[in-house]
Each structure stands twice: as C-alpha cells, then as structure tokens.
Amino acid sequence: HAAEFAAENPDVTLIQLSSFGCGLDAITTDQVRSVLEDHWRIYTMLKLDEVSNLGAARIRLRSLLAALARRQPPAFEPEGFTDRPHFTRECKAQHTILAPQLAPIHFALFETVLRKYGYRVVIPPTPERKDIDVGLEYVNNDMCYPAIVIIGQLLAELRSGKYDPDNTSIMLFQTCGACRATNYMAVLRRALAAAGFPQVPVFAFHGIETDAFRMTKPMLCDAAKASVLADTLMTCRNRVLPYEKNPGDARRMFDHWLEICRKTIEGGSGREYRRTIREMVAAFDAMPLRDIPRKPRVGVVGEILVKYHPLANNHLEEELEGEGAEVIMPLFTDFFLYLACDNIIRHDLLDGKLSAKIASKIFISVLEYFRKPARKALERSSRFEAPCSIYEMMRLASRHVSLGNMAGEGWFLTAEMVRLIDSGVMNIVCLQPFGCLPNHITGKGVIHLLRESYPGANIVPIDCDSGSSEVNQLNRLKLMLTVAREENRRKAESEEEERSGQHSA
C-alpha cells in the first residue's frame, strides 16, 4: 500500500528499510520495486542489522536526494492491468505440464498418477549445479534456498529448448501458510517474465490458485497409494542397502519394485495394491544380507525439499552411506498428515472452525486407511519398523514445543527428531535452508533441549544454501559418525562384559 501511495503521488518518495535475515523482506522488496519501477519512480532500499555502518546509508540517501533534484517529475500514464496467464481446460489437452523435482522416489510415482488422469506431466530428473545458478540469476538471492532450486530447475528446463513455451504450463504445490513457500508462485511468475516466458501459466496442485486443475477423489486415492508405496519402498531399500551380501542386489530389487509400483498405480485394484505391498516387503525381508553388527543409524530430518532433494542437500544420503551409515529417512506421507493437522490445532488452540477440523480428521483417516496394509506388512517383517500415527507424533512434539508452531515444518520437525530418538536412532542430521526462520526455531532451537532430555542424542544441524561448502558439511558428518561409532563400540564392550559376567556366574 505504501508503494502504491508513493507511486501515485509524484511529490512522495519511498525508502524501504529491510532487516538482514528477514525472510519476508525478500518478497516485499521485489514487489515494492516492481510497483515503483512500473510507475517510473526511483526505488531505494536500505538493509540494516545490529552492526550496520550508517555511513553507507548516508551515501545512499545523499545520492537519492541528488537524483531527485536533477530528475524531472515522471509523466506517467497508467496502462490497463494485464491479468496473469491461467491454466484452462484447453491447456490440459494441449500443454506439457512441468513440475519441479523434490523427492525422486515419490515424484516418480506422483508423475504416474497425474498422467493416468490425462495430465501430460513431466518431472525433470535431479537438476545439476548450473541450474541453481539460473535460479540465482532470476530470484532474489535473499529468498530461501528451496525457491532458488525449484525455480532455477524449471527455468533451465524451459531454456533448454525441449519445450514449447506457448504450450507449456508449470505446476507447484502451494502451502498457504506462514512459510515463504506460499509465495513461490508469485516469485516464479516474476522470474518467468524476466527470463522471457511471461506467457507460461503457473497453477497450484493444491492451494489457492489451482485454476482449472481439479483434484478428484479417485486421483486423491491414487496419490495416497503412490505416497505409501514410495515410503515403503524407500524404507525397505534403506534398511538392506548397507548390509547387502551381493553388491547391487538392493539397487536391482529397488528398480524392479519401483516398476511394479508404477504398474499397480496405472491399472491396479485395491487388492493388487495390498498384494504389491505385502510381496515387496516380503522380498526385501528375504534378501540375503551380511551377518555383521548393525551400522550406526543416522536419521535425516528438516525442511522437506532439502531433506529429500539430492542436489539441495549435496547428496547427503549417498555421503552417509559411503561413510558406513544406515540412513533413516522419515516418511513423506507424514508431511501431508502434518499439514492436515493445522485445522485441528487451529480449532483446539486458536479460532479455527469445527467443520475444518472434522474435514481434516476425515482426510487423515483416508490416508491412514491406505497406509494400513503397509503398517501390517512392516509389523510382520523381521527387519522393518512400522510407522506411527500422526496423533502419536503430535503427542511426542507437545513434550517440547507448542503445537501452535505451524509455520514451515513447525512442530512436525521436533516430532520427527523425538520419534527417531525414541526408536533408538540417536544420530540425527537436521537440515534447514539458510535463513529459514520457522525451522531454525523448531529445528536448531530445540536441539539443546533435546540433548538435555536425551543425553545420548548426537544431533548435527546443517544449513543448506547455494554457497554452502560441501567440504565443511562432509567434515561435520564425519565428526558425527566418529562419535556414533565410538558409542556403538562402547555399547558393544558393555554388552560383552555383561555376557562374560553372566557366564562366570
């Protein structure tokens, strides 16, 4: 509103003060600049923090005053408002729909679901480092790292020449919360216009700006199946991979079952879905493994993109496996359940509606219905652990933080760490984008508390951004694993002493 007022009044000049590290300022500064420059006005921004030298600010202000003194008042003539391009029913038949990569296993199956219902969706493979440079070129560098990764990848795909911009649309997931991810669509549209693709429609898979896209009940059911299948496949693969007797067995079995999961989604019935889960778990449970002691288990938690996206976290999972760890990845389905809990918490703690709470509970029941076959199969296995309910996750988090922390990953991030510790996984890597304030509170902010509550917890926080040092990250992981191995050795010696004592007695 201030920018509009200054733009419409030639005798008013606007100076915006931006706080260093304030996430929302990365969005508002771009929008204020756009409003003023569209009206041919000068935009001035001063970035301040507790150690700022006001000398630089004085120079900027003097420069502004000198420019205003020499400048003629702009003769601005307002132009008609141009609406953004929309995703229409015609686009469904004609357009290729680009969607960003986030979690490779899960999105391979989500792509199958959308194609089944007539959407020509393409989810590009894991991007390269140069794609992040494209994001840095067109996105405010103070914006959170996931936005730079996602937008950089999509722009790189459009610039590759593989797609006709006039017949291409982009699909994103809109969270509609306090997280900056709610604004990714506006940031992406601005980047598309700057890169020369203003005609490309951007719409939401879920959120406010869905345009002509509709999530039908059959599509929702298939998406739930895809998420559960991918979670189960990921859990089984990660458990057997460090112990495989014949190198490559885990990878071959993973590829085999991923293809079966695709076919199950494309044309399988509910009975086939349940059979696929049972047989997949049984196959991994029977896979030949080396008879060696359990390796250090390391849980990976954090912001959803940097947790699952290989490039965004510098291929963390591969690094941990290469260092001799067993990687424990939280389940993707739990994130959707966490989002559904918002309406429950708003009703219980704030001013939320009862109808929204009931709708969320129904949604949770539907997801749990599709997860029931996986839970049963994992419980019957000898190697794998079954997932706990989202209500149990809420209870675990409420020990340490208020459930009112709903921005970003909120209380769910704390719940993931507590759940891992309660299940015996004491080594945890907590990932967050640099400057992600909500996750710094419920991630980094609770680590000290968790260490006090669980003295054996070995938790390492790692910030991810475009300039993060891979060497520094690797050194921190090696230090964490050294502590983990020492703890494993100490426990083994203690158990051996106990056995020796019992034998002597």
Task: Name every feature range the model reports, one short phrase each.
Residues 1-505:
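An N-terminal assembly and electron-transfer interface module characteristic of large anaerobic redox
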